[in-house]
Swiss-Prot record:
HAMAP family according to UniProt: Spermidine_synth
Example GO molecular function: spermidine synthase activity
Lineage: Bacteria, Pseudomonadati, Pseudomonadota, Gammaproteobacteria, Lysobacterales
NCBIfam families per UniProt: PRK00811.1 (NF002010), speE (TIGR00417)
Keyword Transferase (UniProt): yes
Catalytic activity: S-adenosyl 3-(methylsulfanyl)propylamine + putrescine = S-methyl-5'-thioadenosine + spermidine + H(+)
Subunit relationships: Homodimer or homotetramer.
Gene (name only): speE
Pfam families on file: Spermine_synt_N (PF17284), Spermine_synth (PF01564)
Catalytic residues (positions): D160
GO terms for cellular component: cytosol
InterPro entries cross-referenced by the UniProt entry: PABS, PABS_CS, SAM-dependent_MTases_sf, Spermi_synthase, Spermidine_synt_N, Spermidine_synt_N_sf
Family: Belongs to the spermidine/spermine synthase family.
Official protein name in the record: Polyamine aminopropyltransferase
């Protein structure tokens, strides 16, 4: 990461590429017990949240990610009531989940309280549901939380984590997925951010392999644009306990949803279920 000549630049060694944003200065910085969190102001992308030198979100395009990690799973499940979010400290995913009026309970567990406090201060638009009576915000280890989660108690688990390094490394292995499998009801769904399908298909394949070893029977990786992330393309992976799951969604409910979105809609959901051939071939779909 550099800010030379008023640019924030992040280099991606794994993809041999970089991305930069013109900034006017650093607004805030905190070193938590887990990571360094920085906030920059940019000329064209609003504010930037950077964690340990990696860009987490911008004001301009975060809605794409937050909508795609939330609504596809919630409209695929037949009647979600209880949701767990692991990670998600910026609270944008929580906001999207609580747009669904039939959701009764959401527990968000992020290891680093400072991410949420920085989001409340600099991205208040993401935190509008933090005081919703249906929401419980916990600041502790998500791996430990899922290990202690009651059996057959959750409809949808959303793993909104950083990259599989540092504090998030434990969210990408069989042991964690076994905890998720046990906590989910029989018709429950797990959805997790799964990096760039353009550059990191091997990582996605390994994730799905670990999920399979934990007991999950069916998978669907959904790609979408995310301009501020490596390669400009990102994905989430949806997993089911049911072997014959085809991930059909409640299309009528998605079409008539009683809330606004900026990216997600029923037509887009239908299209994202048909991945590009190179993804389908690599993942055996």
């Amino acid at each position: 990461m550099t800010t030379k000549d008023t640019w924030f630049t992040e280099h991606f060694q794994a993809t041999g590429s970089a991305i930069g944003f013109r900034v006017t200065g650093k607004l805030d910085e905190v070193q938590s017990p887990f990571q360094k969190i920085e906030i920059y102001n940019s000329t064209d992308w609003g504010k930037l949240m950077v964690i340990d030198g990696a860009l987490m979100l911008t004001s301009r395009d975060n809605f794409i990610y937050h909508e795609m990690i939330s609504h596809p799973a919630l409209f695929t499940h037949t009647a979600p009531k209880c949701v767990v979010i692991i990670g998600g400290g910026d609270c944008g995913t929580l906001r999207e989940v609580l747009k669904h009026p039939d959701i009764e309970q959401v527990t968000q567990c992020d290891i680093d309280e400072q991410v949420t406090r920085m989001a409340e201060k600099h991205f208040p638009e993401l935190c509008t549901s933090n005081n919703d009576p249906r929401a419980t915000l916990l600041f502790s280890d998500g791996v430990a939380y899922m290990a202690d989660c009651p059996t057959n108690s959750v409809d949808v688990i959303i793993v909104d984590s950083t990259d599989p390094i540092g504090p998030a490394k434990g969210l990408f292995n069989r042991t964690f997925y076994e905890s998720c499998f046990r906590a989910l009801k029989n018709d429950g769904l797990l959805i997790q951010q799964s990096e760039s399908p353009l550059a990191l298909l091997e990582l996605i394949k390994e994730m799905r392999h670990e999920m399979s070893k934990a007991g999950f029977k069916a998978f669907k990786t959904l790609p979408f644009p995310q301009p501020c992330y490596p390669t400009g393309w990102w994905s989430v992976t949806l997993s089911s306990k049911q072997p014959n799951a085809n991930f059909a969604f409640r299309q009528t409910d998605a079409q008539t949803k009683p809330f606004d979105t900026l990216y997600y809609n029923a037509h887009l959901h239908h299209g994202v279920l048909a991945p590009p051939p190179f993804i389908a071939h690599a993942l055996g779909e």
